[in-house]
UniProtKB/Swiss-Prot annotation:
Chain segments annotated as coiled-coil in the UniProt record: none
Similarity comment text for this entry: Belongs to the alanine racemase family.
Described purpose of this protein according to its UniProt entry: Catalyzes the interconversion of L-alanine and D-alanine. May also act on other amino acids.
EC number: 5.1.1.1
Keyword annotations from UniProtKB, A to Z: Isomerase, Pyridoxal phosphate
GO molecular function: alanine racemase activity; pyridoxal phosphate binding
Active site: K35, Y264
GO BP terms, alphabetized: D-alanine biosynthetic process; peptidoglycan biosynthetic process
Record flagged with keyword Isomerase: yes
Protein known as: Alanine racemase
Cofactor(s) the record lists: pyridoxal 5'-phosphate
GO CC terms of this entry: cytosol
Taxonomic superkingdom: Bacteria
């Protein structure tokens, strides 16, 4: 783990983002989604910050993540929505973790685990409304609801929630979202006819929370917006603040002649006499190799572009006639307050999404936390 590079995480920004999203949710509860190590920000600190900002639920992909939150002393409701075979269901039930049921086979697994735990399982039925990924499809909604109703009547589980996930919410005018919401209402009707009465119905991710009031239901699940990044490129959300700033101290700087090849494969060749600054971060830290000759970096008070191939541990920036000294700082991305690039700028440069940019920053880069909530 390096001391010369850091991902500085503003926990007050996370809390403030949740508070802002709660206002936009207009009465719906807010689930802070902290899967994938809190989108690279650190799961436990992000969870605490989200709760401090007004989240009443936490969301993870896997049971192991939820158990880590419990081990950290967090007792808020947690939903783990992706349950592969072999997961520690009994341990999850003992820990009071809500489980997402997205396949028919999982129902029997959870019932068996509840018997072993001698405790009611808390489950959320996931219905597939058109994403065609996880979730029980329309042909099996009635059978799933009936099976859950029988298990609930037997005292083995309680159906805490019903949920789904949207495919195209980041395209506000895409009719697929309306079609999925209509399908979700149909699924809720099936659940109601089976005699189930879930506490929370939820389908809205960050994009739907911000653009589709009809998708909010009882609970919303902001993911990327929790961390201050817009779920829709080009959509400005006043008040959202990016929480992560990725930076490193420069290792050195050298003057080179025109025509000098830079880094592996000489994919960048200088066209003049110039200064090259060396940044000690690379694809071993989550900086994509695809950032070669494409991604922006803030060095010596200006935005530059990575020059040459991104290596495992380092990359080069052409700074022209400007000068730097070892120990000066290069900022890869941050809130943009001082002219530095943002994670969205990186996403635009690499033809990807900001989610990937922040989530892929590796464990070799220490997280340094600021803010009142720790």
């Amino acid at each position: 783990m390096s001391s010369f590079a850091e991902a500085r995480i503003d926990l007050d920004a996370i809390s403030g983002n949740i508070a802002l999203l709660a206002e936009r949710a207009a009465g719906a509860q807010v689930m802070g989604v902290v899967k994938a190590d809190g989108y690279g920000h650190g799961m436990v600190p992000a969870a605490r910050a989200a709760l401090a900002g007004g989240a009443t639920w936490l969301g993870t992909a896997f049971i192991a993540e939820a158990l880590q939150l419990r081990a950290a002393g967090i007792d808020a409701p947690i939903l783990a929505w992706l349950v592969p075979p072999g997961e520690p269901l009994t341990e999850a039930i003992d820990a009071g973790i809500d489980l997402g049921i997205g396949s028919m086979w999982v129902i029997n697994e959870v019932i068996d685990a509840a018997r072993q735990a001698r405790r009611q399982a808390r489950i959320h039925l996931k219905v597939d409304t058109g994403l065609n990924r996880g979730g029980i499809g329309p042909a099996d909604w009635s059978a799933a609801a009936a099976a859950l109703a029988r298990a609930e009547a037997a005292g083995l589980l309680t159906v805490t929630g019903v949920f789904s996930h949207l495919a195209c919410a980041d395209e506000p005018d895409n009719p697929a979202t309306t079609a999925q919401l209509e399908a979700f209402h149909q699924a809720l009707s099936v659940v109601d006819k089976a005699g189930l009465h879930p506490q929370v119905r939820h389908i809205a991710n960050s994009a739907a929370l911000l653009t589709r009031p009809d998708a909010r239901f009882d609970l919303v699940r902001p993911g990327i917006a929790t961390y201050g990044l817009s779920p829709i490129p080009g959509l400005d959300v006043p008040g959202l603040r990016p929480a992560m700033t990725l930076s490193a101290t420069l290792v050195g700087c050298k003057r080179v002649r025109p025509g000098s090849g830079v880094s592996y494969g000489y994919r960048y060749v200088t066209d003049r006499e110039t200064n090259l600054a060396l940044v000690p971060l690379g694809y071993g830290d989550g900086v994509p190799r695809a950032a070669t000759n494409r991604a922006p970096v803030f060095v010596a008070g200006r935005r530059r572009t990575i020059a040459g191939t991104v290596c495992m541990d380092q990359f080069v920036v052409d700074i022209g006639d400007d000068t730097v000294t070892p120990g000066d700082r290069a900022i890869l991305f941050g809130p943009g307050d001082h002219g530095e690039p943002t994670a969205q700028d990186w996403a635009d440069a690499l033809d990807t999404i900001s989610y990937e940019i922040v989530t892929r920053i590796g464990r070799r880069v220490p997280r340094v936390y600021t803010g009142a909530v720790r």
